[in-house]
Amino acid sequence: MGHPHPHPYAPAELHLPGFVPLQLSQAQILVPYLATSLFLLLAVWLISGRCSRRLSDTDRWLMCWWAFTGLTHIIIEGTFVFAPNFFSNQNPSYFDEVWKEYSKGDSRYVARDPATVTVEGITAVLEGPASLLAVYAIASGKSYSHILQFTVCLGQLYGCLVYFITAYLDGFNFWTSPFYFWAYFIGANSSWVVIPTMIAIRSWKKICAAFQGEKVKTK
């Protein structure tokens, strides 16, 4: 027996009882997200320039990134984790629509794949707040700043590895077309591979330099 509203996801036999079709277009979903993200980055950049301590441009950009990634983890990913019936809501929220759209690139989200929910849950509950703490640590010049950044980056990279490896092991058949594979599955996640890698390397060097400095002092 078919669904009242056939879903657009792959594989076609995916069972989604009560599925409610998307009510917003791709543009209506992406434009507000991108506009809000740009506004956030601009706001953090401007605020970071007024900190009581002088910050380098690198630190200000890092504050922008950690604010963006922290709020993304908490708000966007958090709504996925704690709204298991987002695909069947008769009056869907904007975030329900976000995840129904993204699921065209990875149907494990709309299918509530246990591994995916687990990774996103850890990300939303632990890495989200830790990312916002990194904003404060950088602004305040806290001694734990680089250790915190390095740790969160490792968590993000581990999450990405699990995300991609489980997709491969499960058959790589979760997207509706090559466009959604490259735009959503690869493109939307690439920032959380490239940027955390760069930050982790930088923080590792800073931590090593600090330990080396302590060794010189104790000689």
From Swiss-Prot:
It catalyses: lathosterol = 5alpha-cholest-8-en-3beta-ol. One of its GO terms (molecular function) is C-8 sterol isomerase activity. InterPro entries: EBP, EXPERA. GO terms for biological process: sterol biosynthetic process. Its EC number is 5.3.3.5. Keywords: Endoplasmic reticulum, Isomerase, Lipid biosynthesis, Lipid metabolism, Membrane, Steroid biosynthesis, Steroid metabolism, Sterol biosynthesis, Sterol metabolism, Transmembrane, Transmembrane helix. GO terms for cellular component: endoplasmic reticulum; endoplasmic reticulum membrane. Its main location: endoplasmic reticulum. It comes from the Eukaryota. It is a multi-pass membrane protein. The chain crosses the membrane at residues 29-49, 62-82, 119-139, 181-201. Residues 58-200 form the EXPERA domain. Pathway: Steroid biosynthesis; sterol biosynthesis. It is found in: Endoplasmic reticulum membrane. Catalyzes the conversion of Delta(8)-sterols to their corresponding Delta(7)-isomers. Belongs to the EBP family. This is Probable 3-beta-hydroxysteroid-Delta(8),Delta(7)-isomerase. It comes from Oryza sativa subsp. japonica (Rice). The lineage of its organism: Eukaryota, Viridiplantae, Streptophyta, Embryophyta, Tracheophyta.
